[in-house]
Amino acid sequence: MPAIDCRRLTPVLVVDAIEPVLPFWDKLGATRVIEVPHGAALGFVELRLGAAAVMYQTVASVAADLAAESLGRIGPLPRVTSLFVEVGSLADVEARLAGEPVFQPRRQTFYGSRETGYLDPAGNPVLFAQFLPPPDA
C-alpha cells in the first residue's frame, strides 16, 4: 500500500504555559510563525528553525478547543513529549544553550551521531544530534 500524501508532521507539545519555553527556543534562533492568545496569555505558538517546526499549546487552550468527550479520550494533560532534532553543529547548540538543564551529557552513539539532550522549561526532553561522516569516508 502506498504511503499517504503527507505534507507536514509537526509535534504539538501541550504545556501549562507557553511564555516560559520561548527563551529556550529564542536562544536557538527560532522564529515565531504563529502566536494565538488565550485570555491574557499565549494559548498557542508555532516556532520554526529552518524547515523544522514545533508547536506549543496550553492545557487551557486545548480544553477550550476540544469537546469534553474528546478531551477525556486523550487523558490528563500536560504530558512530556520527547523531541529529536538533527542539527548541523552540536557545538553551536551547546554554546547557545549553556546554562540550560542537561538530561543527556554529550555522547557518541554507535549509529554515528554526537548527541546532547536538554530539558525545555516545561520539562520536555529535546535531544540534539549531529551525524558525522564515517571515519573512512
Residue positions per predicted region:
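Vicinal oxygen chelate
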Residues: M1-V12, L28-V85, D92-L119, Q130-A137
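Amphipathic alpha-helical segments
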Residues: A17-R32
